[in-house]
């Protein structure tokens, strides 16, 4: 863990949970807190999974270690909630926000929280939440409540005879009926996971326990040498996978795709209808029913099966890394192709996301050039077609094609003749037309996927499995492509387009002397030297001296320029951590300058009624503060995207 990464994590923890991070004796000494208060603070950090803890079986001493990756993930809370809200709705995002706030939480505790109870219409003409708080309701809910109100006398009797914050006996059931489908939808996407005891152990302690358990097995003790080490490595990997597996089972369909996953209408740029991802493998007797029932604007599964109330759940950040990576790749595909093609690619990535637990198999990143190819699961072509919005015009960004020659594989087009019989009835003609339109749509879809498979990006890869056309994505190549683009963007902004040309030549050719580099890049010697000197001073290129003899004289020495992407990425990553820390520190400084004023605006009576209680000068100050805070937080979010590309993808 680097210096600036530690500084950034401290600032994030301070901003979210207060100044309770330091060695325990130092906290007791500096803050004058009692050991009991310090232990409570330590429990809060464990609750948020910000530290690992391990009690040794030998001496019984508890050891603690900072989980800096969990601390860093606090900065992604906004992006995570925005993604979930766009996919699954506001209520599911509220549920996930509550889980984020508590770190890890039991499902039975979520059922008792008033903010997660749905808002239901009362007979008094008001929208009353299950905890009794008034809310805002829509026109549809007004019509529903008007249907339940019979006369004015009944309204008065309800308003006077029952307290306003009371609810019907079935409100709790409605709360559970909405909470559990929301949790199931999060579990279906893999956005939440079941908390295991091993999740509170540091990776090093977990490996030590795994080695101890595997080496004590009878089938391993008899081995020696290389076979013994291979058995230990394989056993440790299996042990850790079993102990840390937090997958929430999905009932009888746990081995296939989850039932009930729906696409949000806002997921596509066009006004597409909400459409559930169809199952690839359904048990016999089950029908793939497209049920588009929603509770308000949020997703609600038709299955009323309750989840285990004793299950402890938390946010699965690794799965969100996969989802955020897919979004970044979809944006890159839109920049390189077209909007319609990017939506096709988004459908392919969405299906792959369901079967991809993490961005990488190993937590540490492999150096540039040593990464093996990592293909995703292969998705059949017809499955991608079913996931695409049927109203999306796939031929919009394609050159004009004669419908009669649209299907070059022998299938008839829209105007084709199926069997030469002109006396077919209307039903046969209609079914044939639907079949032909689907054939044409398959052809158009394959054209978009073929465009994505072109050099130099190679967004997708075509293959055949059991005679079926399938498409997959090679993520390691795309991750390298993203890293190169980000590094080139930074170099261009600091040194100009000529520097990008030099970097690309060095990345492609390796180590070059100045004369050879000048010939390839087609640049003047003076201009090339200036660019190389500036980039070397900033640390983006390196110079290696190779003497031709033992005297090591400058005249007998070759000077080779080279570009080390891994070192540059680490350097940029450290600078990014530092920049994020400075942004958060600046927010704290600006907040302290307006401390008394901001405390006034955060009062419950003022919040939401600023125009009523604040003067025009105070309103102007508040607007300036919010704009400044949004600017700094937006910069932190953009820097986090850079960290994701350089470190996580």
Curated annotation (Swiss-Prot):
InterPro entries: POLR3C_WHD (IPR055207), RNA_pol_III_RPC82-rel_HTH (IPR013197), RNA_pol_III_Rpc82_C (IPR008806), RPC3 (IPR039748), WH-like_DNA-bd_sf (IPR036388), WH_DNA-bd_sf (IPR036390)
Protein name: DNA-directed RNA polymerase III subunit rpc3
Pfam families xref list: HTH_9, POLR3C_WHD, RNA_pol_Rpc82
Keywords for the protein's UniProt record, in alphabetical order: DNA-directed RNA polymerase, Nucleus, Transcription, Zinc
Record has Nucleus as a keyword: yes
Main location: nucleus
Listed Gene3D superfamilies: Winged helix-like DNA-binding domain superfamily/Winged helix DNA-binding domain
Spans annotated as Disordered: 135-176, 266-293, 409-432
Coiled coil regions, renumbered to chain: none
PANTHER family in UniProt: DNA-DIRECTED RNA POLYMERASE III SUBUNIT RPC3 (PTHR12949:SF0), RNA POLYMERASE III DNA DIRECTED -RELATED (PTHR12949)
Cell compartment(s), UniProt: Nucleus
Gene designation: RPC82
Region feature Leucine-zipper, mapped onto this chain: 576-597
Protein family membership: Belongs to the RNA polymerase beta chain family.
Gene Ontology terms: cellular component: RNA polymerase III complex
Annotated organism of origin: Ajellomyces capsulatus (strain NAm1 / WU24)
Subunit structure: Component of the RNA polymerase III (Pol III) complex consisting of 17 subunits.
Gene Ontology terms describing biological process: DNA-templated transcription
Alphabetical list of SUPFAM superfamilies matching this protein: Winged helix' DNA-binding domain (SSF46785)
Free-text function comment from the UniProt entry: DNA-dependent RNA polymerase catalyzes the transcription of DNA into RNA using the four ribonucleoside triphosphates as substrates. Specific core component of RNA polymerase III which synthesizes small RNAs, such as 5S rRNA and tRNAs.
One annotated GO molecular function: single-stranded DNA binding
């Amino acid at each position: 863990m680097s210096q600036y990464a530690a500084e950034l994590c401290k600032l994030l923890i301070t901003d979210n949970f207060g100044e309770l991070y330091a060695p325990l004796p130092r906290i007791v000494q500096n803050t004058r807190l009692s050991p009991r208060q310090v232990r409570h603070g330590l429990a809060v950090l464990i609750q948020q999974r910000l530290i690992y803890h391990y009690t040794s079986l030998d001496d019984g001493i508890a050891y603690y270690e900072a989980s800096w990756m969990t601390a860093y993930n606090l900065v992604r809370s906004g992006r995570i909630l925005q993604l979930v809200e766009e996919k699954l709705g506001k209520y599911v995002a509220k549920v996930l926000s509550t889980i984020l706030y508590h770190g890890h939480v039991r499902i039975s505790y979520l059922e008792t929280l008033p903010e997660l109870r749905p808002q239901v219409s009362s007979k008094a003409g008001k929208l009353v939440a299950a905890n009794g708080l008034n809310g805002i309701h829509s026109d549809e809910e007004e019509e529903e409540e008007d249907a339940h109100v019979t006369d004015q006398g009944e309204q008065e009797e309800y308003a006077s005879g029952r307290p306003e914050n009371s609810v019907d006996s079935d409100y709790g059931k409605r709360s559970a009926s909405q909470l559990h489908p929301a949790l199931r939808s999060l579990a279906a996407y893999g956005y939440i996971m079941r908390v295991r005891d091993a999740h509170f152990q540091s990776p090093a302690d977990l490996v030590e326990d795994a080695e101890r358990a595997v080496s004590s097995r009878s089938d391993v003790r008899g081995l020696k040498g290389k076979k013994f080490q291979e058995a230990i490595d394989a056993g440790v990997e299996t042990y850790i996978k079993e102990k840390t597996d937090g997958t929430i089972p999905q009932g009888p369909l746990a081995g296939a795709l989850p039932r009930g996953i729906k696409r949000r209408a806002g997921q596509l740029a066009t006004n597409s209808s909400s459409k559930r991802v169809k199952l690839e493998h359904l048990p016999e007797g089950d029908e793939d029913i497209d049920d588009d029932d929603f509770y308000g604007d949020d997703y609600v599964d038709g299955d009323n099966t309750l989840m285990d109330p004793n299950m402890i759940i938390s946010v699965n950040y690794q799965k969100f890394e996969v989802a955020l990576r897919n979004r970044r790749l979809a944006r890159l595909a839109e920049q390189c192709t077209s909007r319609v093609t990017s939506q096709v690619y988004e459908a392919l990535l969405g299906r792959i996301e369901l079967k991809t637990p993490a961005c990488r198999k190993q937590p540490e990143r492999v150096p540039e050039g040593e990464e093996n190819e990592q293909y995703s699961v292969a998705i059949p072509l017809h499955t991608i077609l079913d996931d695409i919005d049927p109203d999306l015009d796939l031929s919009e960004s394609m050159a004009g094609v004669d419908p009669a020659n649209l299907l070059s594989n022998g299938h008839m087009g829209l105007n084709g003749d199926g069997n030469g019989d002109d006396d077919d009835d209307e039903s046969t003609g209609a079914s044939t037309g639907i079949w032909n339109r689907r054939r044409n749509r398959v052809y158009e879809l394959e054209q978009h996927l073929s465009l994505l498979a072109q050099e130099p990006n190679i967004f997708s890869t075509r293959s055949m499995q059991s005679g079926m056309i399938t498409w997959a994505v090679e993520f390691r190549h795309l991750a390298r492509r993203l890293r190169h683009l980000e590094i080139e963007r930074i170099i261009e902004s600091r040194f100009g387009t000529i520097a990008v040309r030099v970097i690309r030549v060095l990345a492609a050719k390796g180590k070059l002397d100045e004369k050879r580099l000048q010939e390839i890049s087609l640049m003047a010697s003076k201009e090339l030297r200036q660019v190389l000197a500036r980039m070397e001073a900033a640390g983006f290129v390196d110079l290696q001296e190779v003497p031709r003899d033992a005297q090591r004289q400058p005249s007998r020495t070759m000077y080779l320029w080279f570009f080390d992407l891994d070192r540059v990425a680490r350097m940029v990553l450290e600078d990014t951590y530092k920049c994020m820390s400075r942004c958060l520190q600046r927010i704290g400084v600006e907040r302290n300058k307006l401390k008394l004023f901001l405390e006034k605006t955060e009062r419950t009576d003022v919040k939401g009624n600023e125009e009523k209680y604040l003067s025009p000068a105070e309103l102007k100050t508040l607007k300036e503060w919010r704009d400044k805070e949004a600017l700094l937080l937006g910069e932190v979010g953009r820097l986090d995207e850079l960290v994701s590309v350089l470190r996580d993808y």
